[in-house]
UniProtKB/Swiss-Prot annotation:
<feature type="binding site">
    <location>
        <begin position="187"/>
        <end position="191"/>
    </location>
    <ligand>
        <name>substrate</name>
    </ligand>
</feature>
<dbReference type="InterPro" id="IPR036396">
    <property type="entry name" value="Cyt_P450_sf"/>
</dbReference>
<dbReference type="InterPro" id="IPR017972">
    <property type="entry name" value="Cyt_P450_CS"/>
</dbReference>
<comment type="function">
    <text>Catalyzes the hydroxylation of narbomycin to give rise to pikromycin, and of 10-deoxymethymycin (YC-17) to give rise to methymycin and neomethymycin during macrolide antibiotic biosynthesis. In addition, produces low amounts of neopicromycin, novapikromycin and novamethymycin. Requires the participation of a ferredoxin and a ferredoxin reductase for the transfer of electrons from NADPH to the monooxygenase.</text>
</comment>
<keyword id="KW-0503">Monooxygenase</keyword>
<dbReference type="GO" id="GO:0004497">
    <property type="term" value="F:monooxygenase activity"/>
</dbReference>
<keyword id="KW-0560">Oxidoreductase</keyword>
<dbReference type="GO" id="GO:0016705">
    <property type="term" value="F:oxidoreductase activity, acting on paired donors, with incorporation or reduction of molecular oxygen"/>
</dbReference>
<keyword id="KW-0479">Metal-binding</keyword>
<dbReference type="GO" id="GO:0033068">
    <property type="term" value="P:macrolide biosynthetic process"/>
</dbReference>
<keyword id="KW-0408">Iron</keyword>
<feature type="binding site">
    <location>
        <begin position="238"/>
        <end position="246"/>
    </location>
    <ligand>
        <name>substrate</name>
    </ligand>
</feature>
<dbReference type="GO" id="GO:0005506">
    <property type="term" value="F:iron ion binding"/>
</dbReference>
<feature type="binding site">
    <location>
        <position position="94"/>
    </location>
    <ligand>
        <name>substrate</name>
    </ligand>
</feature>
<keyword id="KW-0045">Antibiotic biosynthesis</keyword>
<feature type="binding site" description="axial binding residue">
    <location>
        <position position="354"/>
    </location>
    <ligand>
        <name>heme</name>
    </ligand>
</feature>
<protein>
    <recommendedName>
        <fullName>Cytochrome P450 monooxygenase PikC</fullName>
        <ecNumber>1.14.15.33</ecNumber>
    </recommendedName>
</protein>
Length: 416
């Protein structure tokens, strides 16, 4: 998506992140650290060609995430949305209060820790089936993205929302096209196709007694449009599906990459699985699935330590750098599953804190436990330097994660 600002006055120099290539995609942390040393806010050009502001450093990141002067509503942006984007942006993630409050309240109860815990048996069943299929590979090798990291969260969120099984593969194509775009036109086409599909899915649920979340939202909209308009219904379906799986895909894959790249930490976790919850939190901090929080737009000029961000400009808060700020996380480049990660921002901060965090954590914990318990000597099947990272400044994700394990009597046994 093009996010070049319109109508701003003289701007500071622009750092072209795209020119840094795969080196930056694979390891953006030194660049972010250099920027942080120079100040909290910087103009950059993303690999897509968008000119935006990056906010770096833990304290500034946390403050901006909770600052009401930074709007999430595109009506406060100087950059117009395309028709395809506008059709899908009527959702809680891209709204400010009171609209945000109203929309979030409609779905919040479905994602409480108590409600999510009720999904544990089904999530375990899905994980067991996927790991069974993966371990059936005759050569003891697989791409973890394809075998587990992607199919688990798309299955869980699709069942929760009532997306038919035959339709789910299309979401991989659509989300890859606009989350990791190679071609802007292709991204717009994907958004239009997803919008059309979701509109048809919503229509198919009208007048039915479905027990899924999307059916419940359809009934709410039909009964009282003041609580949920038809445009908001479409936007909510979109954000729940995309945010409901994309983050968890990369949490599982990035987390397992971090674990497999640090044999001492892998051994420590295998020896004491009570460390699992803390390990997942360290995965979120060390190599989290969200590199930068989604777009924000100042409603007035905002001065960050002497750098003024004009009203309407696009701002990305770099969570990845917040988590590598040594004043907040000592020795931040060390992966340590016993670390105190309290205060990490992987799921955001403030009113837009990720509503699906309990579900993402549940899926990741079950997936990691299953892999370690059922694959005796799970390992990367390539060197870390051979892995390819997507050049997206918001989503931190791998194109593939090749793994291998020992074939033998011990491999593959379910322990639960």
């Amino acid at each position: 998506m093009r996010r070049t600002q319109q109508g701003t006055t003289a701007s500071p120099p622009v750092l072209d992140l795209g020119a840094l290539g795969q080196d930056f995609a694979a390891d953006p942390y030194p660049t972010y650290a250099r920027l942080r040393a120079e100040g909290p806010a910087h103009r950059v050009r993303t690999p897509e060609g968008d000119e935006v502001w990056l906010v770096v450093g833990y304290d500034r990141a946390r403050a901006v995430l909770a600052d009401p002067r930074f709007s999430k509503d595109w009506r406060n942006s100087t950059t117009p949305l395309t028709e395809a984007e506008a059709a899908l942006n009527h959702n809680m993630l891209e709204s400010d209060p009171p609209r945000h409050t109203r929309l979030r309240k409609l779905v919040a109860r479905e994602f409480t820790m108590r409600r999510v815990e009720l999904l544990r048996p089904r999530v375990q069943e899905i994980v067991d089936g996927l790991v069974d299929a993966m371990l059936a590979a005759p050569d003891g090798r697989a791409d973890l993205m394809e075998s587990l990291a992607w199919p688990l969260p798309i299955t869980v969120i699709s069942e929760l929302l009532g997306v038919p099984e035959p339709d789910r593969a299309a979401f991989r194509v659509w989300t890859d096209a606009f989350v990791f775009p190679d071609d802007p036109a292709q991204a717009q086409t994907a958004m239009a196709e997803m919008s059309g599909y979701l509109s048809r899915l919503i229509d198919s649920k009208r007048g039915q007694d479905g027990e899924d979340l999307l059916s419940a939202l359809v009934r709410t909209s039909d009964e009282d449009g003041s609580r949920l308009t038809s445009e908001e219904l479409l936007g909510m379906a979109h954000i729940l599906l995309v945010a409901g799986h994309e983050t968890t895909v990369n949490l599982i894959a990035n987390g397992m990459y971090a674990l497999l790249s640090h044999p001492d930490q892998l051994a420590a976790l295998r020896a004491d699985m009570t460390l699992l919850d803390g390990a997942v939190e360290e995965m979120l901090r060390y190599e989290g699935p969200v590199e930068s929080a989604t777009y924000r737009f100042p409603v007035e000029p905002v001065d960050l330590d002497g750098t003024v961000i004009p009203a309407g400009d696009t701002v990305l808060v770099v969570l990845a750098d917040a988590h590598r700020t040594p004043e907040r996380f000592p020795d931040p480049h060390r992966f340590d599953i016993r670390r105190d990660t309290a205060g990490h921002l992987a799921f955001g901060h403030g009113i837009h804190f990720c509503i699906g965090a309990p579900l993402a954590r549940l899926e990741a914990r079950i997936a990691v436990r299953a892999l370690l318990e059922r694959c005796p000597d799970l390992a990367l099947d390539v060197s870390p330097g051979e892995l390819v990272w997507y050049p997206n400044p918001m989503i931190r994700g791998l194109k593939a994660l090749p793994i291998r394990w020992r074939r033998g009597r011990e491999a593959g046994r379910r322990t639960g």
